[in-house]
């Protein structure tokens, strides 16, 4: 049970890291056996470029000003813009990633480059990336535990079922990505606040605000709702975070629907 008299970050970190059984994890938290360091990572093709943000503003203005369903010409233009928004992507270096069954990889030169460009402390930014990836690891372990696959052989039916669920089935995959990144990035944002790394925390929010939901199921968009809830009621944000975590162990669709309500 969460104790709401504590500070927001302490509650979340305690229940994710030092008391993982409270969120469906085994009593003993097993750190990844593999923590790899590489120079540069592969490119992430999810984030939205400048043209996408401009198109979204135009589409939103159009929707706000007109009843597009009653105006065929404008409805067609709106549909064309919406379709184009789904195709707009740009490349950026990944700073870290978690791979199920393989562990965490941190791309040190990409992290160093990003920190230098913004004047951030390298160690602090590095640690924030690691926090994000560790939450992914803990989340994955929670899924394994839920399906009875913690410590199970990779050939076992339980393990295979957990793996299929973790990656999401067909259309669920995009929703699963949103839920995973929301849980990991919000914890990272809170960690930055606790450590006094406010410029990093603010930059994380700016990235989310700029991207918004230009691409349907944009993975980091869900953090906006939790952050807004935290601003009005840290306790409510704690409850929403814990609820989201629990829902994610049984249904990506329900967890994603909960994010949309924030």
Predicted regions and their residues:
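Active-site scaffold of zinc-dependent metalloenzymes
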Residues: 54-125, 134-141, 145-148, 153-155
